[in-house]
């Protein structure tokens, strides 16, 4: 089985992991603000020393392809590309939304789940999102969306949905307004011995919008997981790409930065 280095820097969480034989053997993470540039390379160095590997002994380097913050993605992609050039190993790019979808699967989907809705915060009520199947397959293109009470109404009407990402907490109250009561679940824990507080995630709380006693389940059992993407959750989608030899052109690879937001909500004509 291949040896993979996994780098995830698309949001406020900076995380890295090493995998062998389809399992994570070591990882590093930090939620320290604006520390991606100073920590990513350090984390990689520490893990390689811990494992006893060299960069040339890696079979591939996988990095988050976005969408995400410009600074974080730039740090992650430049680190990954430098390692690939220096070690002469291939580069794998994994969508941030696909990483989140995998985290939802590892955390546990609601019974009868119809879809996974990963979301990356783009400030205000703006998000980047896509619809994934309960198995994690992408069903729609990544697109910018301005959230309101009617967002994805048809999707929620079809059955339980798992919403995950650093924008889940701002979408949950909108769905609670549209279909109260609702419930939340803990963020995923793909690492070894890490609890929710150490994950950089949090249970979405209805305390500010809907009192907890309002109910123990959304009208259709949907759940909302507030968390950031983790490097360890990249393993499964990265392995799929590795097996298919879906490698990037290292010299020309650029991640999907959060650019100027152009999504709009329809205006009333009368």
PLM segments and residue spans:
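Residues at secondary-structure transition points
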Residues: 31-39, 70, 74, 78, ...
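DPxDG-like acidic metal-binding loop motif
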Residues: 62-96
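Conserved hydrophobic/aromatic positions in well-ordered beta-strands
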Residues: 17, 128-132, 256
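N-terminal beta-alpha supersecondary unit
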Residues: 1-65, 228
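Phosphate-handling active-site elements
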Residues: 49-56, 85-94, 109-111
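Acyltransferase
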Residues: 224-270
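Surface "functional belts" at beta-alpha junctions
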Residues: 23, 90-189, 198-229, 262-263, ...
């Amino acid at each position: 089985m291949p040896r993979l280095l996994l780098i995830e820097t698309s949001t406020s969480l900076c995380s890295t992991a090493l995998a062998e034989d389809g399992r994570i053997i070591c990882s590093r993470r930090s939620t320290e603000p604006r520390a991606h540039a100073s920590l990513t390379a350090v984390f990689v160095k520490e893990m390689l020393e811990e494992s006893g590997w060299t960069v040339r002994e890696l079979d591939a380097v996988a990095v988050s392809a976005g969408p995400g913050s410009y600074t974080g993605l730039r740090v992650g992609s430049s680190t990954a590309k430098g390692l690939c050039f220096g070690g002469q190993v291939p580069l794998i790019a994994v969508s941030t939304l696909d990483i989140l979808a995998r985290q939802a699967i590892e955390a546990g989907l609601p019974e009868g789940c119809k879809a996974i809705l990963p979301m990356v915060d783009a400030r205000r009520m703006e998000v980047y999102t896509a619809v994934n199947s309960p198995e994690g397959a992408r069903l729609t293109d990544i697109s910018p969306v301005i959230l309101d009470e009617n967002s994805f109404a048809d999707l929620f009407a079809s059955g339980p949905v798992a919403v995950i990402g650093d924008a889940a907490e701002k979408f949950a109250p909108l769905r609670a307004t549209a279909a109260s009561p609702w419930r939340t679940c803990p963020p995923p824990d793909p690492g070894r011995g890490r609890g929710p507080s150490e994950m950089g995630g949090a249970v979405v709380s209805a305390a500010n919008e809907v009192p907890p006693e309002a109910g123990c389940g959304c009208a259709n059992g949907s759940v909302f997981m507030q968390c950031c993407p983790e490097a360890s959750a990249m393993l499964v989608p990265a392995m799929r790409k590795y097996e298919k030899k879906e490698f990037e052109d290292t010299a020309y690879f650029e991640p999907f930065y959060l650019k100027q937001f152009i999504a709009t909500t329809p205006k009333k004509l009368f």
